[in-house]
C-alpha cells in the first residue's frame, strides 16, 4: 500500500518538474502565461502596466515573444505601430496565414525595397560604396 502511495507522489513530482522545465525552456509557453495573466488582470479591473498605445496592439494580436509589449513599458514614451502599418501587417498575417514575426519581417522587407534597400539591409544602388 505504501509502495503505491510513494509511486503516486513520485509520479506527480516528476510530472510537475517536467512542466516547470518546459515552461522555463520554451519562451513561447512563458509568453502565453504572461498574456493569460494580463487578460485575467484586465477582466478583474486590475492595472496592467502598458503604455496606452500598446494596449490595442496587444488585443489585436500584434505581439510575440520577440516583440514583447507585455513587459513593463509604462515609462516608454514611444508609440506603437502607426495605423497604416498595423493594417498592412494584419492583412499580411491573414492572407499568408503566418505569425506576427514573419508578417512584420515581410512588411519591413517590402518597405526596404521601396526605399532602395535589399532585404539583407545593403543598398541596392550600384553606385553605393560599403565597408566590409
Curated annotation (Swiss-Prot):
Where in the sequence is the signal peptide annotated? 1-25
Listed A to Z, the keywords are: Signal
- What top-level branch of life does the organism fall under? Eukaryota
What family is this? Belongs to the UPF0357 family.
- UniProt protein name: UPF0357 protein YCL012C
Q: Native species of this protein?
A: Saccharomyces bayanus
Which lineage do the record's taxonomy fields give for this organism?
A: Eukaryota, Fungi, Dikarya, Ascomycota, Saccharomycotina
Encoding gene, per UniProt annotation? YCL012C
Amino acid at each position: 500500500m505504501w509502495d503505491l502511495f510513494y509511486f503516486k507522489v513520485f509520479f506527480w513530482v516528476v510530472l510537475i518538474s517536467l512542466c516547470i522545465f518546459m515552461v522555463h525552456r520554451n519562451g513561447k509557453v512563458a509568453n502565453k502565461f504572461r498574456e493569460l495573466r494580463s487578460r485575467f488582470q484586465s477582466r478583474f479591473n486590475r492595472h496592467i502596466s502598458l503604455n496606452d498605445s500598446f494596449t490595442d496592439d496587444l488585443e489585436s494580436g500584434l505581439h510575440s515573444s520577440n516583440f514583447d509589449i507585455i513587459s513593463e513599458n509604462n515609462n516608454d514614451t514611444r508609440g506603437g505601430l502607426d495605423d497604416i502599418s498595423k493594417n498592412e501587417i494584419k492583412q499580411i498575417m491573414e492572407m499568408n496565414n503566418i505569425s506576427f514575426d514573419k508578417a512584420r519581417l515581410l512588411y519591413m522587407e517590402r518597405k526596404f525595397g521601396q526605399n532602395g534597400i535589399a532585404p539583407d539591409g545593403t543598398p541596392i544602388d550600384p553606385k553605393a560604396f560599403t565597408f566590409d
